[in-house]
């Protein structure tokens, strides 16, 4: 977890903090990040709903359909996440999300996101750099996971030209949106970002999340 309040305090004492406190805060909050990516920037994502109670989660899961994935708005490394295959498992998913969440400023109850389980082919990470020279995307990085645990990465990954074009467009657009938010807060928005993407079995690419750092999957040499 990133202490965004400490980043903000440091930014008041020095010329610049990278990543900016505003960008780090957005990336740590799945609700703010998904609203920015999909609702403001128009990037493709899985169908989703947000919920602040068990009843809202039941309603959201019914809308996105089963199977679905439930995640705390604020968590990392898969903590609190679960795949829900029927309405009977919703209560357990809610409990899992509450136990796996980070400390949240709304009190004892943490909000969650419930999203459809996409027909995933593989995942990609696009390292994207924002600096005074502009925004640059690196060659996408392939990754392999086992039972939800990250195992290995390789760069460049093998994919079609169409997937490459989609991946680079989504990564650049997402980081441009984050930089705009940082600039609106008086920050420059520079940094290295790990943009995580889903590639579906039909070849389409969906936005997943952004880390305000290279991300574990981006640690290639």
Question: Where are the regions a protein language model picked out?
Answer:
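Conserved N-proximal alpha/beta basic substrate-recognition cap immediately N-terminal to
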Residues: 1-64, 76
């Amino acid at each position: 977890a990133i202490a965004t309040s400490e980043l903000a305090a440091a930014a008041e004492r020095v010329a610049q903090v990278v990543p900016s406190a505003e960008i780090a805060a957005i990336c740590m909050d799945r609700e703010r990040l998904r609203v920015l990516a999909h609702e403001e920037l128009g990037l493709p994502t899985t169908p989703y709903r947000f919920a602040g109670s068990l009843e809202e989660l039941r309603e959201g899961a019914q809308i996105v359909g089963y199977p679905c994935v439930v995640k705390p708005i604020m968590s990392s490394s898969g903590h609190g996440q679960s795949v829900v295959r029927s309405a009977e498992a919703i209560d357990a998913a809610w409990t899992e999300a509450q136990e796996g969440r980070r400390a949240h400023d709304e009190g004892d109850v943490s909000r969650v996101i419930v999203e459809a389980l996409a027909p995933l082919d593989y995942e990609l990470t696009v390292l994207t750099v924002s600096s005074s020279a502009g925004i640059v995307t690196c060659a996408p990085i392939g990754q392999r996971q086992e039972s939800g645990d990250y195992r290995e990465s390789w760069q460049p990954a093998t994919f079609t030209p169409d997937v490459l074009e989609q991946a680079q467009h989504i990564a650049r657009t997402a980081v441009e949106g984050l930089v705009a938010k940082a600039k609106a807060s008086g920050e420059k928005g520079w940094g290295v970002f790990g943009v995580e993407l889903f590639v579906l079995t039909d070849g389409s690419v969906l936005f997943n999340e952004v880390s305000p750092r290279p991300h574990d999957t981006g640690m290639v040499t």
